[in-house]
């Protein structure tokens, strides 16, 4: 495991300073090699696909943090005044557990500084590291308010096999919470019946998960879903939002390990994410499973960049 912060060459964008008005883009407001402060928007990369390999998936997600940053660089800053790039946690070979531990430490430090982090993955093994970071920060504060783990995903990722992989993070979170007496609030929205065995549905029921299948996550159901989400938010003190890009239709997000033949429209995914952000309870978000090795015209990286931009506060609701 190593930590890298060599993304200066990625943060480049056109210069429209000769035009009237605010022409800033994210590349013009990014802070490299600087500590995050209170209220700062921050991105942190998790360059890892060791968990995907362990889960018999297609490697390539380790390339995603750089690809997503490249698509973010030219986006207009709008409401953002400063964006801290906290670098990448890089997984060496199969040292997944060390990388997840390092990610947890970096996430906890950003939260302690008062920053608002979005983590750019990487395989969905990112979730186990992200959650541990949030939990470390809360534990250091003596905060035992319930945490809603909200996963927008075609898969439950509740596999019980070990060692951990991209298919196990929410089972690892469930075990962690059970061992420490924390209530687990796990919701998985966008579940594909084609991508989950009866055993995984049974495990979801066992851990008390709330789930909605992809066919009920279409635009026609948005009002019902937001009302359901409001009930979940009301019961939580904090929210960890994780978006697996394979929840989107393959035409929208072709560059993932397991493309979805049906999927949840981007408009719905984005509206759910913004609804969570507007609640004031979002502490941490991450984007998982972007795989540049299989992307088409940077389509998936562009979608990830848009979602990161919205989550960081790039545009008013």
UniProtKB/Swiss-Prot annotation:
- Name one process (GO BP) from the record: L-histidine catabolic process to glutamate and formate
Sites binding Mn(2+) 2 sit at 153, 155, 244, 246
The entry's protein name is Formimidoylglutamase
Q: Which stretches are transmembrane?
A: none
Q: Which PANTHER family match?
A: ARGINASE/AGMATINASE (PTHR11358), FORMIMIDOYLGLUTAMASE (PTHR11358:SF35)
Names of the cofactor(s):
Mn(2+)
Q: How is the cofactor bound?
A: Binds 2 manganese ions per subunit.
Pathway info: Amino-acid degradation; L-histidine degradation into L-glutamate; L-glutamate from N-formimidoyl-L-glutamate (hydrolase route): step 1/1
Family, per the entry? Belongs to the arginase family.
Q: Which organism is it from?
A: Bordetella bronchiseptica (strain ATCC BAA-588 / NCTC 13252 / RB50)
Q: What is its EC number?
A: 3.5.3.8
* NCBIfam families xref list: hutG
- A Pfam family this protein belongs to? Arginase
Alphabetized UniProt keyword annotations: Histidine metabolism, Hydrolase, Manganese, Metal-binding
Catalysis performed (reactions): N-formimidoyl-L-glutamate + H2O = formamide + L-glutamate
Q: What function does the entry list? A: Catalyzes the conversion of N-formimidoyl-L-glutamate to L-glutamate and formamide.
Which SUPFAM superfamilies does its entry note? Arginase/deacetylase
Binding site residues for Mn(2+) 1: 124, 153, 157, 244
Q: In Gene Ontology terms, what is one molecular function of this protein?
A: formimidoylglutamase activity
Lipid biosynthesis listed as a keyword:
no
């Amino acid at each position: 495991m190593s930590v890298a912060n060599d993304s200066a060459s990625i943060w480049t964008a056109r210069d429209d300073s000769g035009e009237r008005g605010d022409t800033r883009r994210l590349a013009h407001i990014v802070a490299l090699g600087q500590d995050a402060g209170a209220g700062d928007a921050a991105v942190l990369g998790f360059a890892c696909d060791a968990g995907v390999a362990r889960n018999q998936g297609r490697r390539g997600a380790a390339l995603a943090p750089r690809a997503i940053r490249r698509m973010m660089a030219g986006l207009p800053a709008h409401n953002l005044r400063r964006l801290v790039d906290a670098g990448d946690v890089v997984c060496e070979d199969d040292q997944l557990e060390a990388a997840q531990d390092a990610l947890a430490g970096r996430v906890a430090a950003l939260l302690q500084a008062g920053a608002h982090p979005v983590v750019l993955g990487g395989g969905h093994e990112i979730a186990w590291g992200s959650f541990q970071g949030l939990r470390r920060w809360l534990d250091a504060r003596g905060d035992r308010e319930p945490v809603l783990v909200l996963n927008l995903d075609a898969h439950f990722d509740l596999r019980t096999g070990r060692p951990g992989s991209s298919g196990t993070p929410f089972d690892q979170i469930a075990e962690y919470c059970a061992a420490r007496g924390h209530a687990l609030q796990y919701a998985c929205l966008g579940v594909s019946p084609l991508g989950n065995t009866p055993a995984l549905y049974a495990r979801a029921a066992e851990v008390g998960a709330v789930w909605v299948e992809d066919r009920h996550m279409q635009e026609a159901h948005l009002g019902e879903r937001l009302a359901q989400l409001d009930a979940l938010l009301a019961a939580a003190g904090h929210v960890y939002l994780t978006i697996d890009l394979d929840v989107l239709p393959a035409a929208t997000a072709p560059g993932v390990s397991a493309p979805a033949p049906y999927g949840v429209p981007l408009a719905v995914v984005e509206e759910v994410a913004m609804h969570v952000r507007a609640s004031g309870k979002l502490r941490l978000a991450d984007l998982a499973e972007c795989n540049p090795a299989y992307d088409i015209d940077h389509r998936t990286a562009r979608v990830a960049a848009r979602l990161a931009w919205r989550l960081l506060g790039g545009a008013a609701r």
